[in-house]
Structure formats: structure tokens, C-alpha cells
């Protein structure tokens, strides 16, 4: 599923960078990575849930990121980091992977190490780990 998360991150980043409406550029059947088996319905579903779910919940996701990253405005964050964070927050908060919350953070870190700046993975780990701790303690926003 790592490849699917990478493609979803790239789509989320692309939508944000191009400031386009998702309907204008989102075509689930036109994935550029030929190595992804888009005939597999569960892969298609996972990909679309990551992208569409992130944007459907963007206001809440951004609010959670703002609450944790007190000294960083979203506008100041690197767009790559922001796309990874948004997808990670969506996965932690809205997807039902109770037994693999740490794996979601690990995936985000791997993506940050490949696509982010030198220290992106540390920043992303800090934000997502803080969110997970808040969720586990019941103090994060609903």
C-alpha cells in the first residue's frame, strides 16, 4: 500500500499546488503510475478514499494541524510537508486502522524522507505523533 500512499500524496500535493478544483484534475482511472494495479478495486478504493477523504475533511484536518503546530502557520509550511501531513492526519483521524496508527506515521515519515527536505520527516513525525497522543488521551478536537 506504500505505492498507493505515495500516489495519493502526489495527487494531494498537485491539487494544492495548482489550486485547482479536485473535479478538474482528479480522475481515478487516469493514474500516471503504470506499476499500480488500478484494476484492483480495493487499491482504487484506498487511493480515492485518501485523496477525496483528505479534501472532504480539509477544514477539520487543517484545524488539527494548526492546533498542534503552534509556531507554524499552514501558509508557512512547505507544500510537500503539508500534503503529507494532511494525508497522515486524515488516515489517523478518519480511517479505521486501529491496530496500525503507528504504521500510518511510519509511512508518512518514509514519504517525507523521499520527497521532503532534509528535516521534513522530523517535523511530520512530531506533528503526527502529537496528534496520535492527543487522540489516545482524548484531548484532541472531534
From Swiss-Prot:
Pfam family, one: NusB
UniProt-listed SUPFAM superfamilies: NusB-like (SSF48013)
Gene Ontology CC terms: cytosol
Keyword RNA-binding listed: yes
Keyword Transcription carried by entry: yes
GO molecular function: RNA binding
CDD domains: Terminator_NusB
Keywords of this entry: RNA-binding, Transcription, Transcription antitermination, Transcription regulation
GO BP field: DNA-templated transcription termination; transcription antitermination
Family: Belongs to the NusB family.
Function: Involved in transcription antitermination. Required for transcription of ribosomal RNA (rRNA) genes. Binds specifically to the boxA antiterminator sequence of the ribosomal RNA (rrn) operons.
HAMAP family reported for this sequence: NusB (MF_00073)
Name of the featured protein: Transcription antitermination protein NusB
Species this protein is from: Borreliella burgdorferi (strain ATCC 35210 / DSM 4680 / CIP 102532 / B31)
Amino acid at each position: 500500500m506504500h505505492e498507493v500512499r505515495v500516489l495519493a500524496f502526489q495527487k494531494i500535493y498537485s491539487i494544492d499546488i495548482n489550486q485547482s478544483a479536485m473535479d478538474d484534475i482528479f480522475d481515478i482511472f487516469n493514474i500516471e503510475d503504470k506499476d499500480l494495479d488500478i484494476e484492483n478495486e480495493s487499491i482504487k478504493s484506498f487511493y480515492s478514499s485518501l485523496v477525496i477523504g483528505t479534501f472532504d475533511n480539509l477544514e477539520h484536518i487543517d484545524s488539527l494541524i494548526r492546533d498542534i503546530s503552534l509556531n507554524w502557520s499552514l501558509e508557512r509550511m512547505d507544500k510537500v510537508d503539508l500534503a503529507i501531513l494532511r494525508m497522515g492526519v486524515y488516515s489517523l483521524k478518519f480511517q479505521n486502522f486501529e491496530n496500525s496508527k503507528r504504521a500510518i506515521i511510519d509511512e508518512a515519515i518514509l514519504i517525507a524522507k523521499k520527497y521532503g527536505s532534509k528535516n521534513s520527516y522530523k517535523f511530520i513525525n512530531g506533528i503526527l505523533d502529537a496528534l496520535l497522543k492527543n487522540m489516545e488521551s482524548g484531548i484532541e478536537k472531534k
